[in-house]
Structures are given as structure tokens and as C-alpha cells.
């Protein structure tokens, strides 16, 4: 079955019993604020261009958000590095196939991500394997923890109210 969403690159995650689930704190759910603004830590919106790399762009944004929240040194993650490695997991390197969010997050948990200055977002290179130096440097920037948010309105609001963004997907037609 083909799950590809035309042109934009998101593929739905299939259920996986190994997912670590996030549950918003009960006390947070009991007192959800009317409004939550996480924008002070949000990076500038990325432009994926004509490449189906939306999951890599969203994951890079979450990484950059988290680094800002932790007051770590400025770092723009390499979206092309993430896109290559999530497609490597899915065995689709030779095509602009899009990817599952889970595989992109899995790749930054296992391999990390190098700076975009080291592996720039040059669409023509999307099939090219990043350099060995990129992989060595990426290990310094591995995701330590990631969890799947239960797709209910209260859990999504609780996640945001707790100060955490989430990587989400939307079909664009």
C-alpha cells in the first residue's frame, strides 16, 4: 500500500508497540491554560522547497527548539542529514519518497545530527550520503529522549502547556 502524501513527503507512522508514550502530568491536565506560547524558543520556519523532506524539517525545528530552551549554543540541524538517514532506515535513499516521523526521530536518537553548515540543504544532493565527518560530528548531537504523544486533544494541549513542542503531520492537498 502506498502511503505517500503527494509532493510534501509525510508518510503515516504504522503502530509500533515499542513506542515510548508521553503522558502529560495529571496536574497539568487538570489546569490547562487557555493559551500556551512556545514561540520564544521556536526557530525561523524552514523552507523545504520542492523536496519531500517535511519530516526532517519538522524534526530539525524540534531539535533547534529544544537547544534554545536548554540555553545551549546556537545550532541549526542539518535537515538534509536527517532526510538522508530517515530514508536509509526505510531503504528509499534513491528516491524523494518522504519518510515517517518515527524513522526521522529514530535516526537522530541513534546517529544524531550534524550542523547544517556542515551538510547544507542543497536539494540536488538529497541522494548523496553525508561525509564520514558529518556522522562523527552528529554523534555529539544525539537526541537523548523522545516520546510519542497520544493523539488526543487533552494530551496534545498538556504537552504544549508543559513547555514541549511535538512533531506533527498534516496532509496538504
Predicted segments, located by residue:
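Predominantly the structural core of cysteine protease catalytic domains
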Residues: 3-8, 29-32, 61-64, 88-173
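Pocket-edge structural micro-motifs
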Residues: 40, 84, 170
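Acidic helix-start/capping segments at beta-turn-to-alpha-helix junctions
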Residues: 75-90
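Structured alpha-helical subdomains that flank or immediately precede key functional sites
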Residues: 1-77, 96-116
